[in-house]
Amino acid sequence: MKELNIALLGLGTVGSGVVKIIEENRQQIKDTINKDIVIKHILVRDKSKKRPLNISQYHLTEDINDILNDNSIDIVVEVMGGIEPTVDWLRTALKNKKHVITANKDLLAVHLKLLEDLAEENGVALKFEASVAGGIPIVNAINNGLNANNISKFMGIFNGTSNFILSKMTHEQTTFKDALEEAQRLGFAEADPTDDVEGVDAARKVVITSYLSFNQVIKLNDVKLVGISDITLADINAASALNYKIKLIGKGTYENGYVNASVEPTLIHKNHQLAAVENEYNAIYVIGDAVGDTMFYGKGAGSLATGSAVVSDLLNVALFFESNLHTLPPHFELKTEETKEMMDGAEPVVIQEKSNYYIVISNNNKSLEKVEYDIKKKLPFHKSLQLVERDQDTYAIIVTGIETSPEKVLNQSGFNIKKVYPVEGV
């Protein structure tokens, strides 16, 4: 039986999961790909470190050149993390005709197009299923399952830590601070939780998903970013009274050749599927022109969940190992001649979409009825308006079916706006 030699970069949480899955499912893997996977090298930072796995049969090295210069290595699996010098290692591996599998969202959010071009130039695969949503096979779904669709929008819960915190606040009336501390105790949140609670982790995944969905390269700075640290129980309870839940939603839309991307607290109607996604689970909702609405759900992190996605990529590469296939590009180019003309023109055509908003305003000692009356007079045409008392000083409002953000109009009319979040699933 042919052997498939792989090198593993990293033996932390995900790397250990990869080794465990390969060891425990070795016969099933052999039956699937008709090849035996051999882990020839494992790159670690400290060979003397004690590890939960028995790794005595593996060659551990602290020298990346042991891997890059080994011509027998077929696939490099990178689960070490970091951008530098990791990107240089992966570039060298691709140039040396080695397939690359990575779970590194930080790196891909910056260098995905560069690495994909290198893979194509060298006739090898670049796979990154684990980089977006752990065990959820969203990359394969978009690249292959939905490749007959023009995708116009995706939105989802991309970060399990923030979703766990919001679930605790919603169902147990826990404060943000206490929910975060529990997430840290359970290992869902890092000692420094900034990337999770301020939306940076989700934004990196939105950058990757935008490239997959729309075949457009955007940067992290292109993503509108608002975290959940300002969400209070007053917001949670006001949303509930209005029949909504608050989730940290990553979203991308594609119109006339342009991508709009965001990560921000969003009110999701309780009847929408995303509202039912709780605790550390992730879900991604994708809208295609042919298939309509689809949703992908599962655990977005963890040793075995993420390791499963890595090994899945490994098997997919192995199945096509003797062919000329390499990583599939995102679904066909969305820039038709018509949209190219729009993009090349001085004034791009903009499709006006109706939007929905959650707004918190000071009550200014006015009754709920008086505030509702005043807002209806000042706002441009809208579909519906709901108001509740948020706390003794503020009212919470949901306005739907409006063409422009109500923030400017209400500010000019003397309303003191405290917060504005989008609303979905109406």
What are these regions (language model features)?
Residues T86-T92, K105-V132, V139-I142:
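Rossmann-fold NAD(P)-binding glycine/threonine-rich loop
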